[in-house]
Amino acid sequence: MTNLNYQQTHFVMSAPDIRHLPSDCGIEVAFAGRSNAGKSSALNTLTNQKSLARTSKTPGRTQLINLFEVVDGKRLVDLPGYGYAEVPEEMKRKWQRALGEYLEKRRSLQGLVVLMDIRHPLKDLDQQMIQWAVESNIQVLVLLTKADKLASGARKAQLNMVREAVLAFNGDVQVEAFSSLKKQGVDKLRQKLDSWFSELAPVEEIQDGE
């Protein structure tokens, strides 16, 4: 298994929908979660870059599909956050459409990191996201973010509860506690990404006429 250097990750582009993304080949691992789950912070912590992914105090700022390249053909994708109430309905529909299209049609999507606040895990949309990935044979890593907000005992209890709950999905779903602030769980995230990028088969580019 190759240990990739995530500090070399660089921003490639932002796209409103999959039609504006580059060729659908290689391997992509997407980060998904509710608007305040800490996706951008997790990406910045993983790559040890303070501003690779723009963090915001205002949930719902990630409205585009943001693409980052680790090395050639291996990409991380920051998906639009879901489930934030204070967003105009039309805008919300547009994001959800872009999100759904990416999840359903992007062939190079091979792994999904679902982030959820450890204090409020497994909301309906989180469960739908895991269910969809399992049905699509996509491996899932659940990160319970903001783990530093709970004392050790409560953290362990939440972790065990979620691990127990995801068994019902009957899929390849791993659950870890994560804290961008304390750098907890970053090694587990790196290990999982390394295994996905090393072991999953990259998608070949479709040539015109195929």
UniProtKB/Swiss-Prot annotation:
Mg(2+) binds at residues 40, 62. Residues 25-199 form the EngB-type G domain. GO terms for cellular component: cytosol. Keywords: Cell cycle, Cell division, GTP-binding, Magnesium, Metal-binding, Nucleotide-binding, Septation. Pfam families: MMR_HSR1. Its cofactor is Mg(2+). InterPro entries: G_ENGB_dom, GTP-bd, GTP-bd_ribosome_bio_YsxC, P-loop_NTPase. GO terms for molecular function: GTP binding; metal ion binding. GTP binds at residues 33-40, 60-64, 78-81, 145-148, 178-180. One of its GO terms (biological process) is division septum assembly. PROSITE patterns: G_ENGB. Belongs to the TRAFAC class TrmE-Era-EngA-EngB-Septin-like GTPase superfamily. EngB GTPase family. Necessary for normal cell division and for the maintenance of normal septation. PANTHER family: ENGB-TYPE G DOMAIN-CONTAINING PROTEIN (PTHR11649:SF13), MSS1/TRME-RELATED GTP-BINDING PROTEIN (PTHR11649). This is Probable GTP-binding protein EngB. It comes from Salmonella paratyphi C (strain RKS4594).
